[in-house]
């Protein structure tokens, strides 16, 4: 037996620990290889690819309309934001003009999607740190939002509602009134969650000064969305590079100051309030009119036309069997998705299928910083850090 003073025994070898992919706080199929010194994290090596489906390659074999549903299945917590980015990119290549009513409905549903995403993130982050009540309250409101999705598109998650040229169909009667009623009652829930968490001493101990990221680090890592704004950088694509009707809307960009888990929570809570304000403005200003472009080479004709017009029937058949040809060229469009900058880059060779489609997922940039964020923290802090990252592996692995 070696004496305790022996140099060989005084060097503690780091313990290697597997975190996930079957772990309730892993938020999907995340696998982390942790190097631990006791309870302190010395290094993290994230392993990705367990949900890789080859989405970018699959898109090359589909027409532009058939490729749309793949985007619902990337970040499956906020599907319409990704449909929106893809549709805007295709419209940029087609130089297609979308009717004003369709733009308003797109923005309404994109902001509902932001609320949908942040409700899940805040409630699951709270659950990961031991608070169960917010999950029960917030999931009740998520159900209401998913019912709006279902009434508009027929599906709770994979909506395929925002399409190149406009939207799939106008909203059913009474839906906009119900969304307005939701905007009236929803702030009460935010006030209740605020009262439960924001000044709660246990919540603050678990999140303040945990996973701190400086402004310079956030820019170096390629952060965007709430992760970037929590560091104090007021970068929001809806303000800096406005698309659709955002330049006509009045809203603030919430920012943090410390760049820690607590600030990321505060930013997301404030963003939900701003989204409600945006939805109200859209509901008050939404015009009447068509919801699809009148170019029948891009959007299908109205169903009534199919009963008496042979030309409409031919357009409908050609559109859904062959699709439309997109002019040769390339385009990149990014939208302010709930998790950050979601970008779509399409190269067209003039056929009815994309030659190349590159997807820029915000969660990919955020996950790569987990080693720097968690180093030196306790193992118990890792769940708070992962919760504040707001990652979904559908978009990271693609």
From Swiss-Prot:
The cross-references to Gene3D superfamilies, in alphabetical order and at most eight, read: Cytochrome-c3 Hydrogenase, chain B
State what protein this is by name: NADH-quinone oxidoreductase subunit D
State the InterPro entries in the record: NADH_Q_OxRdtase_suD, NADH_UbQ_OxRdtase_49kDa_CS, NDH1_su_D/H, NiFe-Hase_large
Stretch forming the signal peptide? none
Where in or outside the cell is it found? Cell inner membrane
**What family does the entry list?**
Belongs to the complex I 49 kDa subunit family.
Q: What does this protein do?
A: NDH-1 shuttles electrons from NADH, via FMN and iron-sulfur (Fe-S) centers, to quinones in the respiratory chain. The immediate electron acceptor for the enzyme in this species is believed to be ubiquinone. Couples the redox reaction to proton translocation (for every two electrons transferred, four hydrogen ions are translocated across the cytoplasmic membrane), and thus conserves the redox energy in a proton gradient.
What are the protein's GO molecular function terms?
NAD binding; NADH:ubiquinone reductase (non-electrogenic) activity; quinone binding
In terms of SUPFAM superfamilies, this protein maps to: HydB/Nqo4-like
Q: How does it assemble?
A: NDH-1 is composed of 14 different subunits. Subunits NuoB, C, D, E, F, and G constitute the peripheral sector of the complex.
How is this protein situated with respect to the membrane? Peripheral membrane protein
Give the E.C. number(s): 7.1.1.-
The record lists the catalysed reaction(s) as:
a quinone + NADH + 5 H(+)(in) = a quinol + NAD(+) + 4 H(+)(out)
One annotated Gene Ontology cellular component of this protein: plasma membrane
PANTHER family for this protein: NADH DEHYDROGENASE [UBIQUINONE] IRON-SULFUR PROTEIN 2, MITOCHONDRIAL, NADH-UBIQUINONE OXIDOREDUCTASE 49 KDA SUBUNIT
Organism domain of life: Bacteria
What sort of enzyme, by top EC class, is this? Answer: translocase
This protein's UniProt keywords: Cell inner membrane, Cell membrane, Membrane, NAD, Quinone, Translocase, Transport, Ubiquinone
Q: Which cysteines are joined by disulfide bonds?
A: none
């Amino acid at each position: 037996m070696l004496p305790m003073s022996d140099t060989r025994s005084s060097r503690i070898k780091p313990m290697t620990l597997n975190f996930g992919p079957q772990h309730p706080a892993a938020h999907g199929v995340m696998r982390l290889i942790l190097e631990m010194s006791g309870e302190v994290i010395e290094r993290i090596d994230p392993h990705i690819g367990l949900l890789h489906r080859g989405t970018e390659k699959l898109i090359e074999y589909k027409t532009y309309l058939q490729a749309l549903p793949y985007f619902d299945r990337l970040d499956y917590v906020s599907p319409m934001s990704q449909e929106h980015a893809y549709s805007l990119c295709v419209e940029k290549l087609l130089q297609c003009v979308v009717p004003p009513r369709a733009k308003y409905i797109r923005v309404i549903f994109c902001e509902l999607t932001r609320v949908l995403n942040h409700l899940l993130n805040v409630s699951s982050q709270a659950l990961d740190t031991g608070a169960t009540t917010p999950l029960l309250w917030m999931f009740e409101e998520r159900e209401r939002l998913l019912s709006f999705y279902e009434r508009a598109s027929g599906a709770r998650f994979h909506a395929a509602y925002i399409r190149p040229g406009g939207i799939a169909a106008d909203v059913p009667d009474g839906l906009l009134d119900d969304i307005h009623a939701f905007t009236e009652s929803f702030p009460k829930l935010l006030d209740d969650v605020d009262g439960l968490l924001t000044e709660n001493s246990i919540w603050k101990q678990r999140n303040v000064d945990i996973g701190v990221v400086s402004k310079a680090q956030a820019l170096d890592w390629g952060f965007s969305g709430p992760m970037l704004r929590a560091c104090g950088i007021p970068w929001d694509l809806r303000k800096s590079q406005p698309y659709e009707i955002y330049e006509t809307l009045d809203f603030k960009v919430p920012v943090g100051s410390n760049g820690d888990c607590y600030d990321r929570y505060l930013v997301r809570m404030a963003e939900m309030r701003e989204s409600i304000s945006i939805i109200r403005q859209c509901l008050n200003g939404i015009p009447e009119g068509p919801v699809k472009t009148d170019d029948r080479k891009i959007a299908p004709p109205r169903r009534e036309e199919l009963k008496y017009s042979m030309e409409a029937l031919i357009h409908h058949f050609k559109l859904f069997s062959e699709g439309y040809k997109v002019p040769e060229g390339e385009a990149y469009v990014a939208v302010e998705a709930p998790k950050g900058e979601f970008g779509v880059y399409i190269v067209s060779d003039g056929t009815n299928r994309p030659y190349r489609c590159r997807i820029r997922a915000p969660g990919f940039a955020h996950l790569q910083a987990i080693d720097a964020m968690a180093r030196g923290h306790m193992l118990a802090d890792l769940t708070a850090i992962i919760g504040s990252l707001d990652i979904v592996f559908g978009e990271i692995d693609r």
